[in-house]
Amino acid sequence: MILSYAYYLCSGYKTVVFILLTTIVTFTSGILLERTEDNLDKSLKADGLAREDKKALKEKAKTYKKRVVVLALLLVFGVLAVVKYHNFAIENVNGIIKAFGGNGRISTFTLLLPLGISFYSFQSISYVIDVYRGKVKACNNIFKYALFVSYFPQITQGPIGRYDRLAPQFLAEHKYDLAVIQHGLQRMAWGLFKKFIIADRAGVVSDLVFNNPGQYHGIYVIIGVLAYCAQLYGDFAGGIDMVMGASEMFGIHLDDNFRQPFFSHSIGEFWRRWHITLGTWMKDYVFYPFSLSKAMNKLGKFFKKHSKTRFGKYMAKALPICLADLLIFFIVGVWHGAAWKYIVYGMYNGIIMSFSSIMAPVYEKMFKITHINKTARWYRGWQIIRTFILVNISWYFDNAATLTDAFLSLIHISEPTRRSYI
């Protein structure tokens, strides 16, 4: 923990208050949740309690626990929203004021952005929710918990850890093992190769094209996005390799964050292979709670009741999933940055996944009519190529300076090549 905080202080001592606040809030929340559950168990074991009394005690405890979780969410994500997205919000408010003919303008201001705040915020909130669900026991030692939140190899770019997998490793005895250290160094070296040989070299080409969206057309725009694809993967996956290699040298095994994403057969599979820990976080803490919520259940029943066609009944099941996908990828877009281009980037992926879910019965019918073998090698190859193309289209929104530049680059793909060099 001392080493992790020393590393964190190197990025600036002024921002350490944010990680301390997150640590204290989520640690305290875990203790309160655990204590409430223990007190409930003791109360329920008391003699002479009627069934109604037990039910009332359970409801009271459940309400209190929900309030603790909501308060933790508001505090942790509230801080994240303020420090990371305040100027984006102000700029949009100013745009609305101007659109309605107003002359007033709210001034933007600069706040220090704490190192790794998105990662440790998500990681610490997962702990609170897991304690609430009874998946893990609350940690009763704030120093041990602080290590989980601040573990230095992963704090800058992940992977997003889970308490039930990391805490036992932190508490376990680790002996010197030369083979483990060598393997960790090898993985770090592989990460350095991806970063400095692949990503940095590809970045020269992608920067040239994306920094001058009006100058390059045709094949050069495609070359630019392919270079960015290599740059992004080399930079991100290489960084993760270095993180995991360094952590492995300490005897701590982190969750995989990449699994050959460019061999995916669909956008959904791509996101199960790319930034895996973010995807599983969204699945466990957003997708399932939202898609299985009372509101989505009522929506599904409404469609089922008022739909007379087979497709309508299918939509009763598919719609909650589609809406959950859209919500997840809206959050993923916001996660990537405070700009509309990132929101469009996220929604692009969400719309494709939702559309695929809605059209699944239609696709199945087409396969039967055309007698296409979905397991055939040629078809599987086509799926990989199709997914790769769709993914690379999304990179235009991710890497362009503005949303306008992204659309400009996409338009220029269909235009004749005007540059004789790159």
Question: Which residue stretches match the model-derived regions?
Answer:
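Membrane-embedded transmembrane alpha-helical bundles that form the catalytic cores
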Residues: 1-414
